[in-house]
Amino acid sequence: MTICTLTSSAEQQINTICKEHNVIAVTLNLKGGGCAGFEYDWGTISDAQDIEEGDEIIATNEGFNFVISKHSLMFLIGTEVDYVKSLVGSNFEIRNPNAQSSCG
C-alpha cells in the first residue's frame, strides 16, 4: 500500500529545502482547522531522533527524507505531492483522494 508519492518536482524541492536549511527532512502532518476540517502542516526535521516510530519515511534521490506523521497516515493514503511553479508563485500541491472538499 502506497501512502504517498512524490513527483520529481516535489522531490527536487524537498532536496532544495533540506540543503538550504541544513535539515534532514521535510514533514507533512494534518491538524484540525481549515475550511474542510483539516489543514496541512509543513515542517522540517534536523535530527533523526525527531522521527517517531511509525512515521512514514520517503527517501529522496539525494538522501533527504519526506516524513508523514503516523497520526496523519490514514488520511493521506494514495496522496500525491507535487511542486508547482506559476507566474504568481510556487507551492506544494497536495492531491488527496480522501479529501471531501478543499478550500478555494
Over which residues does each language-model region extend?
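Signature of N-terminal electron-transfer/Fe-S-associated modules in redox systems
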Residues: M1-G104
